[in-house]
């Protein structure tokens, strides 16, 4: 019988301060007062094209100074936040269910970036002033209004300037679910997708129709105010949306339920009992009157053992296990969003990262423990797990389009955004400095082919074959201008299975996992892979030498799989005829060889075995 797995994540606890702003919590050591100036979409006196009146524009641009340097914040409304059939449910004091379908298209939740900073991001709530985060030049900043207006005083401060109560990361382990006997789980778990179909699934745009539930403690925590609760959840989901864009997944809110009278399930300090109770409620109650792909419970309870979130591994699309439970433990919406992103990752088949899993910047989302610094991206291991999940389970429910409120807005010339029907948009004529664009009409000047872009030079397309983005490593590819477009083509990588690092490894979704890189990650730049004799320890099946675990038992490696178990390394401090390995009582997977690592010619590690490239990476050799 295939048994789904529950994983709990333990994080640092930062208690809610009972305040509407971070500044009022008293945890900010230093901040700067700024006055954002909204850059008008159109100069005074110009006629704006007719469009439906909305309170919140589809695109906005603000300018202010941070540390004396000008910052231009470009914002675009997150039009993939809600499903068209979005509903809200709460309960009267006598327990009567009240369900409405409120208009949510004209909302105030935005994603964006800092102008002229390609690696910047921004997540902003613009309901009453600008409230949120932006990342620029590797620094994460918080902005929040001091008064309820987008043009009056705002506070800007570095995230790192916040006082931290407990910086020690906490860890936790996996819990086997031994009680499931559902036939649906068996059928889904035994499904296998061909490599060709799996690649098709990976490239397809995916949508998770998410149903959010706030328990009675959360409702009371926010002064028993439904509006405040919904704003909190919308803000959290706006962050979650941004995290999943890299996987081509849109997390779309299909419903919000607030247990305003009393909890509908048993919620207590046991995270496992709570999530099982929530899963049973979803199956027996929720799914009968509201379709959804996944449901997440936001609770005000403090789980035992500092657990902040829990979910079923690989439970997505399953009527019994497509759920998670998240503790609302922090004033910072981004930290709650990080936990929810992590738990959704488990539902999508992702396991906890080990020490050898790497990210380009900052902490990885699927680390078993998080500290005060929010994560930025999924690791190479998470990509592997997600690909394996798609290949073996297919998760059909996330492949349908949920009919989001993604309505194409009428183009407005002069707002600085190139929209449908425009050839360019350099802003109002009085500020436009682009020699290729007619600011008044948003059309290219005569004989101009382009106005901006990495492959645009002096108003003409750069020649085909000219470099516009250099390869970063062995598994990346140079991007070249096509001669037919101003934009640099999308980032492409060598095919999965392409040899890399002097034939030490094979490319996997743009990374090159090798034993050497993993040793260096664990032991420093002088570390090397240990002699083959050290890996023979993996045939012992003890705590320091095994290939995989089954029901808590260490399974020894078969001789052909020894390079896919515990990782053994050496460095200058290693004594002769000995080898080093990494072991942690708190994280059993720590120090194991990373999936996708080369273990022979045409072979890579997967599931504690040395298997063929075609099977492991979903490719045809």
Curated annotation (Swiss-Prot):
Signal peptide stretch: 1-20
Major location category of this protein: secreted
Database matches in PROSITE patterns: ADAM_MEPRO, DISINTEGRIN_1, DISINTEGRIN_2, ZINC_PROTEASE
Disulfide bonds: 317-397, 357-381, 359-364, 413-442, 424-437, 426-432, 436-459, 450-456, 455-481, 468-488, 475-507, 500-512, 519-569, 534-579, 547-557, 564-605, 599-610
Alphabetical GO biological process terms: proteolysis; venom-mediated fibrinogenolysis in another organism; venom-mediated hemorrhage in another organism; venom-mediated suppression of platelet aggregation
Propeptide stretch(es), residue numbers: 21-188
CC annotations in GO: extracellular region; host extracellular space; plasma membrane
Residues reported to bind Zn(2+): 342, 346, 352
Documented EC number(s): 3.4.24.-
Tissues/organs with expression: Expressed by the venom gland.
Motif (D/ECD-tripeptide): 474-476
Residue ranges constituting the Peptidase M12B domain according to the UniProt record: 206-402
Keywords: Cell adhesion impairing toxin, Disulfide bond, Fibrinogenolytic toxin, Glycoprotein, Hemostasis impairing toxin, Hydrolase, Metal-binding, Metalloprotease, Platelet aggregation inhibiting toxin, Protease, Secreted, Signal, Toxin, Zinc, Zymogen
Described purpose of this protein according to its UniProt entry: Snake venom zinc metalloproteinase that inhibits platelet aggregation and degrades fibrinogen.
Family under the similarity heading: Belongs to the venom metalloproteinase (M12B) family. P-III subfamily. P-IIIa sub-subfamily.
Name of this chain's protein: Zinc metalloproteinase-disintegrin-like NaMP
Organism: Naja atra (Chinese cobra)
Lineage: Eukaryota, Metazoa, Chordata, Craniata, Vertebrata
């Amino acid at each position: 019988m295939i048994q789904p797995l529950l994983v709990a994540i333990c994080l640092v606890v930062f208690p809610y301060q009972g305040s509407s702003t971070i500044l009022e919590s008293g945890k900010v050591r230093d901040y700067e007062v700024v006055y954002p100036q909204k850059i008008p979409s159109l100069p005074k006196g110009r006629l704006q094209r007719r469009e439906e009146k909305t309170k919140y524009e589809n695109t906005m641009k603000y300018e202010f100074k941070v540390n004396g340097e000008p910052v231009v914040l470009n914002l675009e409304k997150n039009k993939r936040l809600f499903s068209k059939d979005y509903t809200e449910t709460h309960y009267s004091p006598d327990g009567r269910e009240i369900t409405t379908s409120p208009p949510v298209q004209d909302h105030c939740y935005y994603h964006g970036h800092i102008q002229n900073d390609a690696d910047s991001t921004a997540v902003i709530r613009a309901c009453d002033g600008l409230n949120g985060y932006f990342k620029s030049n590797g620094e994460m900043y918080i902005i929040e209004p001091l008064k309820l207006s987008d043009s009056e005083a705002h506070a800007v401060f570095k995230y790192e300037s916040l006082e931290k109560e407990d910086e020690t990361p906490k860890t936790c382990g996996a819990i086997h679910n031994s009680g499931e006997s559902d036939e649906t789980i068996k059928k889904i778990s035994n499904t296998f997708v061909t490599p060709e179909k799996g690649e098709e699934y990976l490239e397809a745009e995916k949508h998770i129709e998410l149903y959010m539930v706030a328990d009675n403690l959360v409702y009371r925590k926010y002064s028993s105010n439904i509006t405040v609760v919904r704003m909190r959840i919308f803000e959290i989901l706006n962050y979650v949306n941004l995290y999943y864009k890299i996987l081509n997944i849109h997390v779309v809110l299909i419903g919000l339920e607030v247990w305003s009278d009393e909890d509908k399930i048993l919620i207590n300090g046991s995270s496992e009992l709570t999530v099982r109770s929530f899963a049973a409620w979803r199956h027996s109650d929720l799914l009968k009157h509201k379709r959804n792909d996944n449901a997440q419970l936001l609770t005000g309870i403090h789980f035992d053992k500092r657990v902040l979130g829990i979910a079923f591994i690989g439970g997505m699309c399953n009527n019994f296990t497509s759920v998670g439970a998240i503790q609302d433990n922090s004033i910072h919406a981004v930290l709650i969003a990080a936990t929810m992103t992590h738990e959704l990752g488990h539902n999508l088949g992702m396991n906890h990262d080990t020490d050898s899993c790497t990210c380009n910047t900052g902490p990885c989302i699927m680390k078993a423990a998080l500290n005060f610094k929010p994560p930025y991206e999924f690791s190479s291991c998470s990509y592997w797990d997600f690909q394996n999940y798609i290949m073996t389970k297919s998760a059909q429910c996330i492949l349908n389009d949920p009919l989001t409120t993604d309505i194409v807005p009428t183009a407005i010339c002069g707002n600085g955004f190139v929209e449908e029907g425009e050839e360019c948009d350099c802003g109002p004529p009085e500020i436009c400095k682009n020699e290729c664009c007619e600011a008044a009409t948003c059309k290219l000047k005569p004989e101009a082919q382009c106005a901006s872009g990495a492959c645009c030079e002096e108003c003409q397309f750069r020649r085909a074959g000219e470099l516009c983005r250099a390869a970063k490593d062995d598994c990346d590819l140079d991007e070249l201008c096509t001669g037919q477009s101003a934009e640099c083509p999308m980032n492409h990588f060598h095919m999965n299975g392409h040899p890399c690092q002097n034939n030490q490894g094979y490319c996997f979704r743009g990374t090159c996992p090798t034993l050497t890189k993993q040793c260096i990650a664990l032991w420093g730049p002088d570390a090397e892979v240990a002699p083959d004799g050290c890996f023979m320890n993996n045939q012992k099946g003890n705590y320091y030498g095994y290939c995989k675990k089954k029901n808590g038992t260490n399974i020894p490696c078969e001789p052909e799989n020894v390079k896919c178990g515990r990782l053994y390394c050496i460095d200058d401090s290693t004594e002769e005829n000995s080898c080093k390995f990494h072991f942690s009582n708190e994280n059993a997977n720590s120090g194991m060889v990373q999936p996708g690592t080369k273990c022979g010619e045409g072979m890579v590690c997967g599931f504690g075995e040395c298997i063929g490239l075609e099977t492991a990476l979903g490719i045809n050799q």
